[in-house]
């Protein structure tokens, strides 16, 4: 069984709005904005997406130079079953729109002492065997011990942070196993401090450091929960998108439009409009005002709350 098929979002949320005749505004044609627009449009809502840039996909972009394609942001896809689920529920199978293939081997590491480590895709046993071959039995045993911790982190964080919306702080701390879960995630520990405690081989430590550095973070301060990334890659595999990762954004934008969503490019949103604490629409950079009782912001939280919403307090979930 393909391990990626084991992934299935547990939460299928239906947007709560007054009427489906109301127009929904989505800020940003990144992957999250496009996914929201697709599901909303498929459910019968009128959807308009405003994207500041000239193309869809957000950080998932590909440029072509002299016949070669280069990904300018992420280059690998993990958990493709998330997209399979989205495409299946909004029309055609993902495979009918895009070629997604496992990267094999997943990674090739070369170290200054001449050591080479080649890691397979979607194989926990194969990964341990490769580490043992290159670094020895002790390193392999330490890696497996670390991945057991990462597996627990993934089990704890997957549902509340990945598959569900994060409501209030109260809803988070009221979880039955909150204290045990906090100990597992160890938010007070950095990635490097946890890894250095579990791993003795400096090459393996360097390998794990890169899960912080490739996102522009410092492993000395990045949270230990980043260990879930190598775990997910090891278990669910690393995948290549035919034509480059930007192709994923293109086909998702097409899917959103096929479902009825309208997308306007080169059209930044300058402000989310509110009245009496309720959203009334958005103001575009060109001065246009688009009225809407429902706005989905795919911008990061700092931009959304720090600029687009002005000085309004952070939203609370109302039942």
Task: Give residue ranges: language-model regions.
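Residues forming anionic-ligand binding surfaces in small-molecule and nucleic-acid pockets
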Residues: 222-233
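Rossmann-like flavin
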Residues: 112-222
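N-terminal glycine-rich phosphate/pyrophosphate-binding loop and immediately adjacent elements
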Residues: 19-158
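Extreme N-terminal leader/targeting segments of oxidoreductases
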Residues: 2-24, 42-43
């Amino acid at each position: 069984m393909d391990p990626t098929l084991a992934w299935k979002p547990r939460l299928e949320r239906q947007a709560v709005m007054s009427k489906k005749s109301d127009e929904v505004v989505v800020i940003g044609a990144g992957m999250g904005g496009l996914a929201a627009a697709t599901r909303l449009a498929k459910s019968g809502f009128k959807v308009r997406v405003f994207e500041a840039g000239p193309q869809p996909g957000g950080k998932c972009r590909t440029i072509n130079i002299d016949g070669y394609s280069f990904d300018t942001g992420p280059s690998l896809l993990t958990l493709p079953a998330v997209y399979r689920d989205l495409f299946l529920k909004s029309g055609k199978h993902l495979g009918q729109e895009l070629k997604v293939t496992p990267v094999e081997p997943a990674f090739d590491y070369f170290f200054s002492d001449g050591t080479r480590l080649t890691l397979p895709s979607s194989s926990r046993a194969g990964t341990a065997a490769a580490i043992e071959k290159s670094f020895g039995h002790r390193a392999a045993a330490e890696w497996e011990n670390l991945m057991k911790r990462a597996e627990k982190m993934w089990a704890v964080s997957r549902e509340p942070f990945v598959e569900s919306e994060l409501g209030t702080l109260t809803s988070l701390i009221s979880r039955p196993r909150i204290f045990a879960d906090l100990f597992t995630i160890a938010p007070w520990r950095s990635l490097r401090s946890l890894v250095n405690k579990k791993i003795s081989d400096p090459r393996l430590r360097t390998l794990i450091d890169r899960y912080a550095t490739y996102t522009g973070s410092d492993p000395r301060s990045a949270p230990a929960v980043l260990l879930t990334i190598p775990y997910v890659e090891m278990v669910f595999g690393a995948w290549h998108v035919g034509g480059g990762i930007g192709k994923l954004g293109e086909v998702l934008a097409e899917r959103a439009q096929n479902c009825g969503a309208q997308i306007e490019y080169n059209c930044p949103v300058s402000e989310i409009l509110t009245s009496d604490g309720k959203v009334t629409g958005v103001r575009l950079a060109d001065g246009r005002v688009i009225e809407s009782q429902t706005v989905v912001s795919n911008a990061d939280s700092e931009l959304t709350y720090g600029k687009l919403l002005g000085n309004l307090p952070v939203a609370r979930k109302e039942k």
